[in-house]
A protein has these predicted regions:
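Short coil/loop residues immediately preceding or within conserved phosphate-binding loops
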Residues: 20
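Switch- and interface-adjacent substructures of P-loop NTPase systems
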Residues: 5-9, 17, 43-312
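Post-Walker A alpha-helix
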Residues: 36-37
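P-loop (Walker A) phosphate-binding loop of NTP-binding proteins
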Residues: 28
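Conserved glycine(s) of the Walker
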Residues: 31-33
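Hydrophobic anchor at the beta1->P-loop junction of P-loop NTPases
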Residues: 23-25
């Protein structure tokens, strides 16, 4: 992981000229994203200040191609700034403590000033600057990207297939309410919100038990969408194919069934696709961290659940 970042920086320095590299770091909750980014920034800022013994495998530091590294203002002022100072203080406290969990997207920018041997003149050295934009975002949002290829029925079927064992136990309260709901009836916003809250409580219980394949990811880390109707829907696990087709043919646009479909489509096309277009598709490189020990400490099902999430 760190080796691949080093290799990328080395290649840019060898090519010369100024350039920007957009690096995203993500992972599921408590995988160490914030601590990793804080450490990476700290290591780069101390190049040429500590004899570079702290980065023995980083060729650009070892051969002193990197002249200096400093933090500079980010270009996109609408994205929250990664709080490097506060996170570093957490790690350096006595005793140390873990950094605050990632709740949304944040960014920081480093300017890496370097020089390299010119390919034209033996004693002439070229200088340039690599701007390293580092993004931190919740891995739970990454797990939503497969929804772009699934309609509401397909997603509901996928969720039905994984709702077993511990998940089935946690889902019971929500499923009881779902089975009593007349999907063809005119929607009541309050009832819909209550059942959606039960579904969210189910997802949070799964997360607390070490499950990591959580969809929709914004339900457990809503960010600026907390309380919005777009986060008030849920899969229909109990319907047969025949029931799906009948509801599609016969229900009106103001029915529970139609509104659930509409909200899922809005979430997929606006929230998930918006994240993909505005952030994910713009990253040059991505580091994904995974905490394998926590699921193992919980149960075999939690570990399998993590594998399912990583394979999406």
């Amino acid at each position: 992981m760190f080796k691949s970042i080093n290799r990328e920086i080395n290649q840019i320095i060898n090519r010369g000229f100024d350039r920007t590299l957009r690096l995203a770091v993500t992972g599921l909750s408590r995988s160490g994203k914030t601590a990793f980014i804080t450490s990476l920034i700290n290591q780069l800022l101390h190049i040429n200040q500590e004899g570079n013994a702290h980065l023995p495998l980083f060729e650009a530091a070892r051969n002193q191609s990197i002249l200096a590294v400093k933090r500079v203002p980010q270009q996109d002022l609408s994205i929250p700034r990664f709080d490097y100072e506060a996170n570093l203080n957490d790690l350096m406290n006595n005793p140390p403590q873990w950094c605050q969990s990632t709740r949304g997207v944040s960014e920081t920018r480093l300017a890496i000033r370097f020089e390299r041997q010119s390919g034209l003149l033996r004693h002439f050295k070229e200088r340039g600057t690599l701007y390293l934009d580092i993004f931190d975002y919740p891995g739970e949002w990454l797990l939503d990207l497969p929804l772009l290829n699934l309609d509401f029925q397909q997603w509901s079927l996928e969720q039905a297939n994984i709702t077993s064992g511990v998940r089935q136990q946690f889902a019971q309260d929500w499923l009881d309410k779902l089975k009593k709901l007349d999907l063809s009836a005119v929607v009541n916003e309050d009832v819909l919100a209550q059942i959606a809250k039960s579904y969210t409580d189910y997802l949070l219980a799964c997360k607390a038990e070490g499950m990591q394949f959580i969809q929709p990811g914004r339900f457990v880390l809503p960010g600026e969408l907390e309380g919005a109707p777009v986060l008030q829907f849920f899969p229909l696990l109990h319907l047969s194919e025949e029931q799906w087709q009948k509801l599609k043919r016969e229900t009106k646009s103001n029915s529970y069934f139609a509104v659930l479909n509409k909200r899922y489509d809005y979430y997929r096309n606006k929230v998930v696709k918006g994240f993909y277009e505005n952030y994910f598709s713009t990253f040059d490189r991505q580091v994904i961290l995974a905490d394998c020990l926590t699921p193992l400490n919980h149960s075999q099902q939690a570990f399998i659940d993590m594998q399912t999430g990583l394979n999406q």
